[in-house]
């Protein structure tokens, strides 16, 4: 069996396995490759109210120590009750629970689900737990289990540029004033902390900022899986993703103490992050709170406070979509939460170019088409070489068939004759494959660009395509892709082996069924690429035909 036949059989076999796996998922069975969100949600319910609200972190063992936080101190079983302060801006609707002063719910008003409702990022109910918490440790001090008092004030912007929600709590002579500042058009909530020692003895509090989340994915994948979990960034250690599984097994590590960086929770299209004050020494921690709840956080020592003294610090809480340019302006490295996979070095320039095209064309669908044309032009010399090689191989098919028939009982002699034929005619049997292989990394990088870019979410193209991030609802693009692949097989040399020929005929159907489950934006790229390839191949075949006719005329 030659190399091409082996490659085809591998592709064909993988396609059948993936199709069977997708059918299994559609019947409610477990996937062989990807985790099922439904199953995770069923087997991993949200943490109980006491657990989700009650676990206060301990101070890290030593400043600068890398690793997970020490186990939390035992907490009282009773869960505090408070009021819900609902804040509405033009971008978010946030719910602040005065029991702990936590952001317990956050809706993104400019991002919508399929039913038209806003995307809910932070949430705390019987199904999901995801919230932003903060407080003081270093004694029995105000923390996210303490009931705060909310100061009166506006709760909607109503034409203003910003609004503030001040929360106050006092415990054991230490008063904490936590102020959330919401701004117009922003997904960043500035958070101010003022700590006053109203007691008679010095105290040394440490501020903690953390994101607590259950370990389930928000949405189920079909043929792809995106990262969900904590991440930590420092200038020294750069971007560091942490798997929930590693946290549960005690294998997770975090960077050493730094005076910069941030902690985040990442999911497909969206992220949240606590960004502490730059220039202040702080340490990081990750921890499994209970079997279904995890947290990532940062601790900042505030120093010793004498009686009557006050110390202030601030931080920023980001919660929103992974829009790359917006993230770049918020904090160094925050754009890295947008996961391009292992081909980031190729994906980032592709997205930059795609965004420039969108700025000119105003439609992401047409921008994908324009980008496909540009990529095709860049790879035109390689593609032309590939088609010319395939054309030469097509001309040699009769002689190759004759050699196979003549030496069918002597494989070694047959291979020698084949190599001699290739050498005489100056043909590389892999010449048609190599240019295609070189283009594969670009295709994979573009795949991740289209998969990871929240800009595609809810972006229409034309007609029936109302969202480029979801599959074509009427399967028109996959069908067009199948037709284009079928036409391509007709332009390629017919394989001499009957089995290989049948595989080539079946492949368009297999790929079209696979692409039923891919985002419409990615299928659009593939369709346009195929159509351009057909036009290019037809033109090159036509030129080769003219060249042969000229040779015959001269002879």
From Swiss-Prot:
* Cellular component GO terms, alphabetical: plasma membrane
Annotated InterPro entries:
Membr_insert_YidC (IPR019998), Membr_insert_YidC_N (IPR028053), YidC/ALB3/OXA1/COX18 (IPR001708), YidC/Oxa/ALB_C (IPR028055), YidC_ALB_C (IPR047196), YidC_periplasmic_sf (IPR038221)
Q: Which UniProt keywords apply?
A: Cell inner membrane, Cell membrane, Chaperone, Membrane, Protein transport, Transmembrane, Transmembrane helix, Transport
The record's Gene3D superfamilies line, in alphabetical order, gives: 2.70.98.90
Q: Which GO terms describe its molecular function?
A: membrane insertase activity
Report any one BP term from Gene Ontology: protein transport
Entries under Pfam families matching the protein: 60KD_IMP, YidC_periplas
Note down the stretches annotated as region Disordered. 62-81
Q: Where in the cell is it found?
A: Cell inner membrane
Segments crossing the lipid bilayer: 7-24, 334-354, 360-380, 430-450, 468-488, 503-523
Write down the membrane topology.
Answer: Multi-pass membrane protein
On subunit structure and binding partners, the annotation says: Interacts with the Sec translocase complex via SecD. Specifically interacts with transmembrane segments of nascent integral membrane proteins during membrane integration.
Q: Which family does it belong to?
A: Belongs to the OXA1/ALB3/YidC family. Type 1 subfamily.
UniProt function note:
Required for the insertion and/or proper folding and/or complex formation of integral membrane proteins into the membrane. Involved in integration of membrane proteins that insert both dependently and independently of the Sec translocase complex, as well as at least some lipoproteins. Aids folding of multispanning membrane proteins.
Q: Could you identify this protein by its name?
A: Membrane protein insertase YidC
Q: Which organism is it from?
A: Cupriavidus necator (strain ATCC 17699 / DSM 428 / KCTC 22496 / NCIMB 10442 / H16 / Stanier 337)
Gene name of the encoded protein:
yidC
